[in-house]
Amino acid sequence: MHAGRFTSMKDTAFFINVGRGETVKLDDLAAALSNGAIAGAAIDVSEIEPLPPEHALWQCENLIVTPHIGSFGSDTDIERQRVIVDNAQRFVRGEPLRYVIDKALRY
């Protein structure tokens, strides 16, 4: 994804990348988010990992970053199920949940 593709999207569109980080130009994504070319984005991967603290994407309030956890496979499916069950039990007991996104920090 690059600037031309972002500008061809509807301004109400949300971009999600859980695939390969190098398929998205981060500076172009930051520009698209900042100038309103798209409504928002969520990325689990980036061409540079971890995303540098000074990168412009961290200033985009319409972005959510997850720590490269979107994956596929029997091992990850089992772990995902464990986390869901554990968080459900924690919720019932009134305990803090694991892996909660801090909406203020957007990750």
Regions found by a protein language model. Give the residues of each.
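A short, gly/pro- and small-residue-rich
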Residues: H2-R5, I84-D86
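Rossmann-like dinucleotide-binding domain for NAD(H)/NADP(H)
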Residues: T12-Y107
